[in-house]
Structures are given as C-alpha cells and as structure tokens.
C-alpha cells in the first residue's frame, strides 16, 4: 500500500489467513522481481522482507509508510493433549505432546501460560477432578510462543443439561480494580439498586472486553464449539445479581470470526457471531426461566416477530461449577440479519434502535422523522396519512409485537428493539426482548397501560403508531384479530403444559445450582430470598408455583382489562377472544 494525496491505496486482492498463497512482484514487462509464499497470518501481523538482510520476517506491529522494524521468524509449533478434552467417568492420566525444539509451560487456573508458569517435563498428569489445562510452547528468541492450547477435562460431571466451559484469566475476573466479577471497596448496598461504584459495573460501562476460551457441548455430549472469543458482562439492573451474565463474540484474531454450530435446535442457523449466557436477568433468584418460558410460548406461533431462542445450560468457569445459565441469542444487528435471512456480513446495512429510538447500529434519523410525521397526521380521516404509515411500518409485525407484550403484561416494557434494512422501500419492524416481568403479575392492566396518551408503561415509551392505527376501524379490527389469536391459543392449559415441560428440564440441576448460589443470594437485591442451599431451592419451587398461579388467573383478568380498554361489547369480545374464561378454582 502507498499513500498519495492523503489517500491510502490498496492492492485489488486479499490474502487468506491460512497461508500457502504465493505473491509475485513483476514489472510492466512481466519480469519477476520477487516472489514469496505466505505463512499462516495472524490478525494485525504483517509479513515482508527486512531492509537489512533481505530475509522474510513477521512484524508486530505493522509499519505502513515506514521501514519494517525488528521482525521474528514465526511461531512455535503448538502442543497437543494425549487425550481429547471432554467427559470421563473416572480419573484420567494425561500427557502433553511437546513439539521438538520447544519447551511447554502450563496452567490449571485458567491463566495464560508464560515462561513463569509450571514447566512441563514429560510427566503424566493425573486429572482427578474437573480441570481446565492450558499449555503453550516457547522456543528460541526469534520465534514467538504458540497459540495457547485449552481443554477442559470433566471428571464425574453428570448433568441432564448440556454443558459449556468458559476459561478466563482469573485476573480479568477478580482483579480489585478491573475484574468483571469484583464488587470493590466502599460499596454501600443499603443505598438501593443499582449499587453504586461497583467495579463490575464500571467494567461493563467502560465497554472493556476480555479474552476467553469457550468449549460448548450439545445434549449428546458432543463438543460443538471450541475457540477463543471476546467476553464481557451483559445486563443492567441484573448486574447486581450474585451470578452475572456474560456475552461472547467471535473474532478472527482468535482464529474464527463466527461460532460455526447449531446452537439452538429450534433455529435453522448453523453459524453465530455472538451469544449470551444469561443469569435469567431480574429472575435470577426466582424461577430462572421466566423470559425463556415466554419465548417458548411465542415459538408456538411460528416466527411472527423476532425474539430470542432459549436453551438452558450448565456452566463451568475455569473448571469450577458455575451453575445453571440460559443460552440466548445476543440481541444485535447479527441476530436481526439472521432472522431476516441476510448474510452476517451484511448486518451493517441494518438500522437497529433501542425502544427510546437511540441507535445501536446505523441511524435513527429517519425513524424519528417518521414518528414526528405520524404524530402530526390523522390516518382516520386522511388516506395519505394512513398510507404513509403503511409504506413505512410493517403493520402486522408491529401488531404481533404489541399483542404478545399486551398478553404477557410486561410491566417493564422498554427493552425492545426497532429495526429495518437501510434501503429504499424497507419497513420498520419490532423485536421482543427482555420479558423478565412478563406474566409476572396477573393483575397488570397492560391494555390500559399500553394505550394511554402519555405512552406505554411506567416510563411512557412512545406508542404513537399504535394509537394512530387504532383510530382506523380496519386496523383496530386487524390488531384485535391478531391479539385475539394470541389470546385464544395461550390458554391456561397450554401455558401450563409448556411451563411444566421447562420446569422438568431444569429441575434436576436446581438443587446443585442452589447449593452453589443459595449462600450467595443477596437480600440487598431481593430482601425475601433465603441464603441457604435448602432454603433457596424451596424458594425456587415457591416462585415456580407463583408463576403457575399467574397463568391460571391471567386469561380471566385480561379479558376484563381488554374489554374496558378497547371499549368492546360482550359480543365483540366473544368475536375476537371467545367467551370469558372462568377463574380456575385452584387459583390463589
């Protein structure tokens, strides 16, 4: 590359990172002046000739527009294990295979091996408990250390749920100033949520990402992911829960730019850019499936509006049992691209907005202009105002979104997303996210809350489009038809059947989970939570029964709320929603 008139010029071809390609430099007559065969290339490393001896070297950092600096000749060959990482019924003997001319150093605590770590001298390592082993080779001065070999060996790790092992340098977790899981000094929890001045919240808000290694197994115990990835904290108020949520993103600097695996059996995708291991959010110390349960209810309708898949996992962190967590798609432009059938590489073509209309990707300019114009319009009387909405909004998608939120009675609405492809003719769509407070209170009057003039929910999120469309009889009918379809299908019996299935799925893991986390339950977050393993498990059972009681009562109460909020007669209610269901006698 060269620079001319402040413009960087680049060659018209790219090179692969795997190596083996040949680059030839010729003059205009075709005479060859130089030819090199490329080695495997790592991110942000250049390869070229030394101006001193003409030899070929790798350079770190690259030096465009300047002479190459001190180079190195490559990387040491990586070590290997004598047995595959995975699950074993008894203690396991293990050796590390050392490439000729190298020295291996290894760790057992999740840290990156250095030449100050334990040297490996050919001995047999006896693995008697679940352990993460990390090994790395070192060679002569002009050769860089190898990539780190990471493997988790599970001993007597019997689980009914699939397992994921996460390895992170302990300093990135527990460092007193920058550790992701560090509370820090001087935190007064009595001041209320969110806790102020915690190290973990400062780390999350700074946007810092640490290096991790992820080994993920499917239901059959087959390893489907084994690679490095960025790791960072996920969540807002749920950050103050004892167990934190993690988000992971594949990066080419770790070798793979995506996770090439079918992470969710109910999704067709076989490649992901990112995912989340979620602590169940605000439901962390309650049922641990509230949000996922509602995702599964939406699945009963097919994919009508974008929402996250849900799959419960058992997590190990640096070889230590870390309890149950929920695998979720990460809500970002890549998730939306997959849902819309786009290539992941095209995700940057999407405008993705938060509920407040703040842009997460792309721009919010045209969305805000649209809302302003719709507010000023009168679609009930002016066809052009109605047509403007129809030209810019996927109305059915929006009505399904509103119908699900209204049925569930999400009292904490405000964490949804709005998106569209940034291209002529594209329409805005909605994505449902964060239903921790859906089906939480059978008496929450969502029809009234979502249709009020000041906006939806406690924080009055904009509902201009909804209120305007409801003034048009044809579209009020369309919304009530979609909402009624949701209502008729999600009977108490249907919801109970799905809930029972999910409870039975995670129940075998709950006693062990609460043995790990019950003593760390935080009464400054939720005052009533028990802080013993036995008490926490019984409390989990109590919260599940509370959820059952909500879904017993919700259809009956929602029928009345809907009738009043939309001004419907009994005949109209029966047309859209069927007869009012009686309150079940077992409802408390």
Cite the ranges covered by each PLM segment:
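Intrinsically disordered, low-complexity Pro/Gly/Ser/Thr-rich segments with frequent PxxP/GP/PP motifs
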Residues: 1-10
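Conserved beta-structured recognition patch
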Residues: 9-64, 227-239, 507
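Extracellular structured ligand-interaction cores
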Residues: 20-22, 33, 42-44, 91-93, ...
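Residue-level detector of buried hydrophobic side-chain packing
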Residues: 23-25, 47, 106, 135, ...
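Structural motif
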Residues: 27-28, 108, 317
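Short, compositionally stereotyped local motifs that mark structural "simplifiers"
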Residues: 39-211, 217-228, 426, 542, ...
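Middle-to-C-terminal accessory/interaction subdomains
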Residues: 64-71, 162-164, 171-186, 190, ...
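Conserved ATP-binding subdomain of kinase catalytic cores across diverse folds
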Residues: 166, 187-362
């Amino acid at each position: 590359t060269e620079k001319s008139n402040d413009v960087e010029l680049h060659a018209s071809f790219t090179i692969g990172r795997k190596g083996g390609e040949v680059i030839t430099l010729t003059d205009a007559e075709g005479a060859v002046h130089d030819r090199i065969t490329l080695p495997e290339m790592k991110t942000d490393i250049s390869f070229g000739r030394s101006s001193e001896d003409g030899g070929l070297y790798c350079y770190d950092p690259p030096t465009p527009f300047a002479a190459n600096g001190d180079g190195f000749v490559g990387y040491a060959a990586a070590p290997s294990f004598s047995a595959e990482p995975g699950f074993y019924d008894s203690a396991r003997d293990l050796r590390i295979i050392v490439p000729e001319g190298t020295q291996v150093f290894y760790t057992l605590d999740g840290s990156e091996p250095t030449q100050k770590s334990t040297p490996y001298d050919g001995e047999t390592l006896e693995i008697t408990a679940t352990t993460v082993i990390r090994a790395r080779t070192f060679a002569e001065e002009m050769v860089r250390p190898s990539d780190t070999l990471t493997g988790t060996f599970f001993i007597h790790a019997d689980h009914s749920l699939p397992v994921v092992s996460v390895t992170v340098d302990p300093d990135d977790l527990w460092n007193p100033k920058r550790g992701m899981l560090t509370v820090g000094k001087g935190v007064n929890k009595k001041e209320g949520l969110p806790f102020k001045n915690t190290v973990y919240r400062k780390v999350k808000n700074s946007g810092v990402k640490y290096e991790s290694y992820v080994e993920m197994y499917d239901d059959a115990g087959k390893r489907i992911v084994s690679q490095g990835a960025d790791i960072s904290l996920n969540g807002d108020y749920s950050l103050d829960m004892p167990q934190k949520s993690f988000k992971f993103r594949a990066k080419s600097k770790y070798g793979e730019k995506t996770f090439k695996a079918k992470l969710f059996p109910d999704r067709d995708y076989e490649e992901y850019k990112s995912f989340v291991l979620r602590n169940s959010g605000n439901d962390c110390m309650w049922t641990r499936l509230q949000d996922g349960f509602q995702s599964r209810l939406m699945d009963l309708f097919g994919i009508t509006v974008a929402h996250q898949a849900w799959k419960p996992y058992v997590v190990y962190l640096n070889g230590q049992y870390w309890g149950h967590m929920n695998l979720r798609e990460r809500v970002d432009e890549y998730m939306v691209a997959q849902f819309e059938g786009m290539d992941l590489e095209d995700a940057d073509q999407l405008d993705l907005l938060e509920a407040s209309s703040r842009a997460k990707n792309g721009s919010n300019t045209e969305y805000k202009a649209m809302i302003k114009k719709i507010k000023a319009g009168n679609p009930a009387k002016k066809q052009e105002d109605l047509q403007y909405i129809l030209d810019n909004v996927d109305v059915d998608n929006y009505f399904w979104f509103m119908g699900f939120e209204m049925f569930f009675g999400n009292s904490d609405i405000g964490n949804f997303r709005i998106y569209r492809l940034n291209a002529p003719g594209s329409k805005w769509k909605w994505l449902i996210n964060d239903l921790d407070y859906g089906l939480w209170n059978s008496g929450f009057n969502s029809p009234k809350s979502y249709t009020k003039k000041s906006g939806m929910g406690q924080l009055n999120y904009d509902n201009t489009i909804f209120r305007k469309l409801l003034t048009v009889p044809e579209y009020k009918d369309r919304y009530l038809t979609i909402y009624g379809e949701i209502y008729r299908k999600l009977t108490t019996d249907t919801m109970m059947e799905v809930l029972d299935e999910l409870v039975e799925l995670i129940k075998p893991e709950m006693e062990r989970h609460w043995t790990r986390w019950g003593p760390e339950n935080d009464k400054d977050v939720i005052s009533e939570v028990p802080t013993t393993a036995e008490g926490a498990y019984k409390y989990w059972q109590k919260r599940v029964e509370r959820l059952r009681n909500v879904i017993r009562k919700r259809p009956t109460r929602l029928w009345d709320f809907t009738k009043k909020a939309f001004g419907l007669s009994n005949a109209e209610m029966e047309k859209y929603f069927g007869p009012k269901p009686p309150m079940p006698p077992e409802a408390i």
